[in-house]
Regions:
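Domain-level signal for soluble alpha/beta catalytic cores
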Residues: 1-320
Length: 320
C-alpha cells in the first residue's frame, strides 16, 4: 500500500483544497466498552494480539460515522513493550504493520460500499515514551532522554508504520518538547507527512511546561508537518490552546480532546469533571464550531469519545 495509492492524495493536499476533516474517536476506551480488558501495559495493543478483527470493526464504525481519518492501534505497539510478553522484535513489528492493515481494510470495505465517499486517510499512531512507561507520564512529560535515545526508541515503530503504507504519522499525546524535537528529526529522516499533537499543563503550555508558542515555532518550521494541535486534553483547554497556537503559526490546527471526563492515572479510572468542564463545552459537538473558528481544520475525539460523538462532529463539518 503506497502512502498515496488509495486516492492519490495526502493530508496536506486535502487541507490545501480547503477541506475541513473529521478525525476518528477513541480506540482503547471504545474497545473497553465492547468488552476488552485493557488493564495491561500494552493497552489497546493487547487487542492486536487477541482480537484484531474487533479493532477493524471499530475503525469501520468510525468511517460509518463520517470520519475521514483513522488512527491506527499502534499508540503503545512497541517492540520494547511486546518484549515484556516474550514477543520477538520481528513479530512485534509485524503487529505494528497489522495495525495499519486493519485500518486500511476497514477503509477499503467502507469505500467499496460508499464509492462516492471522499478520500480517507490512515494515520499511524506514534505515542510518546511516556505511554510505554504506562504510569501517566504522557500527561507530565517529566522523563529525560537524550535526542539519540528518543530517536532509537521511536525509530523501529516509525519504520514499520511507513513500510506498511500509512498516509501520515500521528505523533500524538506528546508532553515533551525534547521528544518532539527527536520525532521531527525522524519525520525528516523517513520523509513522511505527519501531524504533531500535544497534551497540556494549561491552556498555554504543553505538559512539560514549554509554551505552546515555542512548540508551534518548532513544528511550524518542518515542511513535513501538515498540522499542529492538541489531543487527550480536557474540553475546556482546547480553545485557549488553539488561540495560542493560532497566534504563533500559520499551519493548520487540529484538536481531538477527551469526552469531558478526567483520567486518574493512579487509579486508572475516568471520573466526571467537576464544574461543567471549567466553563468549557460539555461535548465535542458543542465545542467543534468554536474550535473551527479558532483555526482547527481537523477535529475528532480522544479518550471516552464514541462513534456517536464523531457522527455529531461530522454533521457539523458538512454543514459548513
Amino acid at each position: 500500500m503506497d502512502r498515496r495509492s488509495s486516492h492519490g492524495t495526502s493530508l496536506s493536499r486535502m487541507l490545501d483544497s480547503g477541506a475541513d476533516l473529521t478525525v476518528d474517536g477513541a480506540l482503547a476506551t471504545e474497545l473497553e466498552a465492547r468488552g476488552c480488558d485493557l488493564d495491561d501495559p500494552l493497552w489497546s495493543a493487547k487487542v492486536l494480539l487477541e482480537q484484531p478483527q474487533l479493532i477493524k470493526q471499530v475503525h469501520r464504525d468510525y468511517f460509518d460515522a463520517g470520519a475521514a481519518i483513522a488512527i491506527t492501534s499502534s499508540y503503545q505497539a512497541l517492540p520494547q513493550g511486546f518484549a515484556r510478553r516474550g514477543i520477538a522484535e520481528a513479530d512485534a513489528l509485524e503487529l505494528v504493520a497489522l495495525s495499519v492493515r486493519l485500518a486500511d481494510e476497514a477503509r477499503r470495505e467502507y469505500l467499496a460500499e460508499n464509492p462516492d465517499a471522499g478520500p480517507l486517510l490512515v494515520a499511524g499512531s506514534v505515542g510518546p515514551y511516556g505511554a510505554y512507561l504506562a504510569d501517566g507520564s504522557e500527561y507530565r512529560g517529566d522523563y529525560v532522554l537524550t535526542k539519540r535515545e528518543f530517536k532509537e526508541f521511536h525509530r523501529p515503530r516509525i519504520r514499520a508504520l511507513v513500510a506498511a503504507g500509512v498516509d501520515l504519522l500521528a505523533c500524538e499525546t506528546l508532553p515533551s518538547f525534547a521528544e518532539a524535537e527527536a520525532l521531527l528529526a525522524l519525520v525528516e529522516e523517513f520523509d513522511v507527512e505527519s501531524w504533531f499533537s500535544f497534551t497540556l499543563r494549561d491552556g498555554g503550555h504543553i505538559s512539560d511546561g514549554t509554551p505552546l508558542a515555542e512548540v508551534a515555532a518548532l513544528c511550524g518550521a518542518q515542511p513535513r508537518v501538515a498540522a499542529i494541535g492538541v489531543n487527550c486534553v480536557p474540553l475546556n483547554l482546547v480553545s485557549p490552546a488553539l488561540e495560542a497556537l493560532r497566534n504563533a503559526t500559520d499551519k493548520p490546527l487540529l484538536a481531538y480532546p477527551n469526552s469531558g471526563e478526567s483520567y486518574d492515572a493512579v487509579t486508572k479510572t475516568w471520573k466526571p469533571r467537576a464544574g461543567a468542564n471549567g466553563g468549557g463545552p460539555s461535548s465535542l459537538a458543542e465545542g467543534a464550531a468554536t474550535w473551527h473558528d479558532l483555526g482547527a481544520r481537523l477535529i475528532g475525539g480522544c479518550c471516552r469519545t464514541t462513534p456517536r460523538d464523531i457522527a455529531a462532529v461530522a454533521r457539523l463539518s458538512t454543514k459548513r
